[in-house]
Amino acid sequence: MSLISALQTTDVESVQTSPEQITERKAVRVSTLQESLHSSEMHRAAPETPRSISNSVHKLKTIYSTYQQSGQPLSKEAIFRAKQKYGILNTPANYKTLGLGDSKSESVDLAARLASKRTKVSPDDCVETAIEQKARGEAFKVTFSKIPLTPPEDVPITVNLGLKGRRDFLTRLAAQKALAFSPSLDNSMKGTSDSSSVKKKRFSGAPIGNEFDANLVNPQHPAGFKSLDLSKVLDGAERRAISRVNDRLYPQKVNFKNGLQSSDQSGVSKANKEVFKKGTLEKLEHSAEQFLESHAGNERQRLSDQQYMCAKGAADAVKDLDPKTLEDPDFAAREAQKKLYIKQVASPVVLNEAQKLANRKLQDIDSRDTYMLLFGNQAYNKLAVNIALQHYSVKQEEKKKIYLGGGLWMTPEEVNAVAKKLISPVVNEIDERASRQRDVDKDIERRSRVLDQEYEDGNSMERAKEQNDGQLLLAMASKQQQEKEAKKAEEGQRYDQFVQKMNIKLQQKEKELENARENRENLRNELQERLSKNLSGENDELNDWNDACERDLKNSSIEHYYAVRSHFDNLGNSERGYDELLEERSKIQVEIERLVASIAEHKTAIHGFGETADAGGAIPAVQKQKIPTRKDLLDATVNDPLVISAEMAKEEAEMATEECMLKELQVDEMIIIRNIMLRECEKKLEEEKETAKRSRRGTEESKNNSNFSRDVIMSTPDNNEKVTPIGKSASPKDVVKSRFLSTYNTGKDIDSSASARSITGVSGVLDDGPKTPTSNKENELIDDEVKSYKVHQAVDGTGEDSIANKRDKSSRPAANSGGSITIEQFLFNKNADKQGLSKTESVTMKREPVVDQMDSKKGHDFTHCNDNGRRSFSGFSQGSIENDYSNEVTDDQDDQEGSEIRVRDSNDSNTSPKESFFKEVI
């Protein structure tokens, strides 16, 4: 009974191989009775009103599409494809290939066998048809046992054969005893031989694989049969019973991920996993497409025809062949011996003894461990079935749910939700790809329309140009001749007038030089007299100046407080601008690379058109023969060069356009590089501001010290000035006098621009060393490198000092460019009398606009950086050179200024943005 139940259970398990029934496997494993009960209950839980196929198909067509995006339930096709994609359904990837290794040889073999079957065989001939040597050898291996049967007296009793060996030995021993003591063996042998011969004659025309050919055995091998080995069956039944009991008593949790069982429990085979790896299916499809492309339909038909002809030839060759010539002469004798031995082994006595021995052994096993075995323990089985029925009756509320095993139930809505989550990435990906493809198609259509229109416009323009050129050539020739003669006469008159004018200017300049020398001597004498009169009031003015310095220090501390608040904002803005410039530069570099590649392609196309045009567009003789009429030949020979020239002109125009775009991008890249340098300088400026603010805090703390003297405040000049502190050690009168005399008594002639020398508004002293003039080229280089950095450094004095140490001493700080003060204004206080202010107040008032000028210039630089993307480089035809001569003094300006000659500073805030822009570009 236990053996039968075990076989039934294994049969039930072997049937359930479909991955769709994986979730119900544990429920079926309980037992045959429990399986029937569960199946009946599940049938009762099925819906009472089944849908017809036509209705479901109609609803799918009308309501649901293949892929849904609006949250509606998915269609059956979508669910099927999702299951197939994730390996839930059975696919051909789960099985090995069923094709033949060598199609030609197999077809020849098959043809030979069929031909031999068609041959006529005599009815008395009991010889079997030919069997291959390999098949014969395999039949012998299966028939004969590896361990020969020995009599019991030859086997020592002390040898431990083990469970399996002992069972084999006892089975063979029972068979020997049954054969030795059975009197009716001969009659049974005769009956079986007669029946076998009848069967052989009856099924002689059947195929080879439908009969068992080994009916006789060799008498030299008395133990040639394979013993009935039930050890594996029993071991497997025990393991399955124990596992089922453990599963009932201690159920394990099944891991699920997105509604599918994970790892090995999901039913996905290793072969399926290998096939569904990333890129495997694409490789298989690609190889299949290559094979189909390489073997066209006619070639594949030709291959099948060749195989058919080969098989037909082989069949014709063996059609009249006698089967006896292919078999072994001793084959009939061996077959008779084999059949005799099989009849002896298959006798009822042997089978009964073997069955009794097997039942006795199974009863011993069942009686030994009854509490662990499921089979043979009817009480245990009934109790398990009753408990299962009680649990099932309690959970009647799960009637409309799907049982997944292990106590897990799911509603159809949850299953649909899981399937929807699994298929939504596929749906989104398909929709995204479709939308991208539609956008690309629209863009291609739009571009094609634009290109066609441009091509038509270009053709019309070329036609109009050719017509106008013919009319303008004659008129332009005569007009150029007349203009040449008029220009020649006009240039002669202008040259004479220019010579006369320059002579007059030279005389005027000589007179002005004499007057300037006389004025210089008079001014020197007058200044010496006035200095002697004004030195008495210098001490009072110096005290007032010290008070003004203290006020300036307080004002600077207030400015420092507000600057600290805006420091971090400026630093963040500078870093963001720096990152934006880097990103814009990378984009421009990518566009430059694309344009270079496109220009190379255009050059290649132009070269190909040139070679075609140089070849003369000659038509080969073979192609001429294919042209039907003379008119078509004329069109081919005349229109083709025109088309080639038009295509070549089109490629040249596109290449010229892209070269212009490349030049513009290169200019924009240079501008962005300069702006990146500006951003880096701004970062350094903010860092130096922080250090300057820390040092200034120390200065404010030391302001209340009683020993703090005026020398500390007054010894902070610009970097280009050499200052002696004004204090108790030297009188102000001696200091001012010595500095004035050292400035104007240096010997030799001093040009008229000496009156424009400026003094600082902080230190209150004159410049000690004269400045060395620099060339225009050197000034431009210094402006290009330092201007953008110095403009932002003008807000902070400490940052200005650090930059001035690194740059050339010829570049003035931005504070001095705010407005120069002549010596007459400083000594005679002309502007102060007009405005009603003291000297110290005028000095402090002049320092305030510097920050405003620098801030305005900084904002202008930011707008200039933002306009770089919209500028177009078209040479110097947009008025960019007009500012190059802005520093020269014209005749009208010379007359208006008189004796005052002021040189325009490169850092002056009045310089135009165009001038600074083109200086950076060049």
From Swiss-Prot:
Skewed-composition ranges (Basic and acidic residues): 687-703, 844-870
Inducing factors: Expression is regulated by the AZF1 transcription factor.
Stretches with biased composition (Low complexity): 871-880
Gene Ontology terms describing biological process: eisosome assembly
GO CC, alphabetical: peroxisome
A Pfam family matched in the record: Eisosome1
Acidic residues compositional bias, start-end: 889-898
Spans annotated as Disordered: 1-27, 34-53, 687-730, 751-778, 791-821, 834-922
Bias-annotated ranges (Polar residues): 1-21, 751-761
InterPro entries on file: Eisosome1
Coiled-coil residue windows: none
Annotated family: Belongs to the EIS1 family.
Protein name: Uncharacterized protein YKL050C
Organism: Saccharomyces cerevisiae (strain ATCC 204508 / S288c) (Baker's yeast)
